[in-house]
């Protein structure tokens, strides 16, 4: 760490220090994006902000853009304990504990893992939206030998993957730059269709337009394996969430469960299997076993999911 300006050097980057700012300079790898690390103007003096900006940018102008909400790129804030990905200051898109990078910090990410109550050994998980990689990392560590494909449309989000300890691509794990809606259609043509499709596809304006139609949800249904599950994080205005819930219910013939979270997110599980009929006592036992293995409070999600089934939330 540079003691003069409190900026941490990043792996693969040399740092040219001045009395005002540290400017990261790519080292011999042109494909490595320039990540500018500055003292954060928002919180405490030990916080930093990471920006995808060139070394010769006007840093004061950039920070004013961030503060005003006009900045149109993702950025990362680090307080020494937690690292968060933002599309704006008003909303945390992803959060990572620096002590435990593979833990799920946000309630909605924990709730999205409730698909394991119904499908414990998926072979292939397709995730739409990388963010800080929280879901992908957790699945990589805790969901058996499942192959994980992550599709992210914004290369600027992918550029931060190392900041969030997202695993390198290997035989089980890969991150692809592309439109999630297009990849859902492609996956429907694969021999090994995904057992789980996780949808967390947001930009700074909310749910991506390409995943906001009945046709998209029909393509998800068609792409899933026979007993497959779609898990969707719906956030934003109540009317928008209700519209998505209605589309999902129509396509999946009301085989839908939901978890309403206090932060305004709705986590929706939709089941392709026409014979879907949950056995809640068995699911409760599964939840206890999963809690022991992963540390997540699956039993509380069983209660909420069963309640949504009884009340026919949609």
Question: Regions from the language model: what does each represent?
Answer:
Residues 214-277:
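C-terminal substrate-binding/active-site "lid" region of AdoMet-derived donor-dependent transferases
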Residues 6-9, 29:
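Basic polycationic patches enriched in arginine
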Residues 24, 33-34, 38-41, 48, ...:
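The AdoMet/dcAdoMet-binding core of the Class I SAM-like
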Residues 28-78, 93-99, 265-314:
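SAM/dcSAM-binding transferase cores
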């Amino acid at each position: 760490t540079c003691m003069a300006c409190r900026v941490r050097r990043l792996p693969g980057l040399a740092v040219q220090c001045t009395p005002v700012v540290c400017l990261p300079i790519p080292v011999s790898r042109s494909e490595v994006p320039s990540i500018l690390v500055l003292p954060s103007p928002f919180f405490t003096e030990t916080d930093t902000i990471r920006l995808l900006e060139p070394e010769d940018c006007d840093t004061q102008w950039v920070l004013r853009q961030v503060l005003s909400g006009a900045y149109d790129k993702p950025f990362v804030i680090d307080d020494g304990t937690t690292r968060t990905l933002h599309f704006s200051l008003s909303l945390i898109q992803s959060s990572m504990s620096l002590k435990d990078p593979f833990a799920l910090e946000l309630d909605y990410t924990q709730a999205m893992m409730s698909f394991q109550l119904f499908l414990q050994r998926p072979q292939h998980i397709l995730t739409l939206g990388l963010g800080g990689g929280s879901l992908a990392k957790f699945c990589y560590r805790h969901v058996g030998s499942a192959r994980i494909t992550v599709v992210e449309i914004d290369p600027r989000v992918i550029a931060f993957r190392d900041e969030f300890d997202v695993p390198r691509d290997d035989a089980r794990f890969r991150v692809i730059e592309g439109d999630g809606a297009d990849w859902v259609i492609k996956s429907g043509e694969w021999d090994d269709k995904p057992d789980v499709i996780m949808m967390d596809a947001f930009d700074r304006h909310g749910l991506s337009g390409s995943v906001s139609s009945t046709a998209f949800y029909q393509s998800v249904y068609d792409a899933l394996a026979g007993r497959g599950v779609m898990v969707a994080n719906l956030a934003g205005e109540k009317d928008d969430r209700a519209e998505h819930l209605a589309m999902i219910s129509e396509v999946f013939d009301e085989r839908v469960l939901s978890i309403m979270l206090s932060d305004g997110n709705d986590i929706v599980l939709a089941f392709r299997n026409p014979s879907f009929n949950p056995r809640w006592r068995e699911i409760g036992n599964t939840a206890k076993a999963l809690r022991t293995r992963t540390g997540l409070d699956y039993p509380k999600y069983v209660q909420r999911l069963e309640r949504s089934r009884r009340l026919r939330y949609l």
